[in-house]
Curated annotation (Swiss-Prot):
Cysteine pairings via disulfide bonds: C43-C61, C47-C57
Organism field: Heterometrus petersii
Domain notes: Has the structural arrangement of two alpha-helices stabilized by disulfide bonds (CSalpha/alpha 2(S-S)).
Protein name: Potassium channel toxin kappa-KTx 3.2
Biological role stated in the UniProt entry: Potassium channel inhibitor (Kv).
Family affiliation: Belongs to the short scorpion toxin superfamily. Potassium channel inhibitor kappa-KTx family. Kappa-KTx 3 subfamily.
Keyword Signal: yes
Principal location listed in the UniProt entry: secreted
Length: 62
């Protein structure tokens, strides 16, 4: 009985650490996507000020 309880406790700790790691990783991915969008918007805005060609700026900035 005691070993079953210890095994269950260990399993819960492992699962909690996996969930914690996954949430941190998801936040990292989300922040990278946000930074990429910010970069694309900034690139597009500067390109539009220079060339005023929307089609060119979309292809240039991604």
């Amino acid at each position: 009985m005691k070993s079953t309880l210890m095994t269950a406790s260990l399993l819960i700790l492992v699962l909690l650490s996996i969930v914690d790691y996954a949430s941190v990783y998801a936040e990292l991915i989300d922040s990278e996507i946000s930074m990429e969008r910010h970069w694309i918007n900034a690139c597009f805005n500067i390109c539009m000020k220079i060339s005023s060609d929307q089609k060119y700026c979309k292809s240039f900035c991604g």
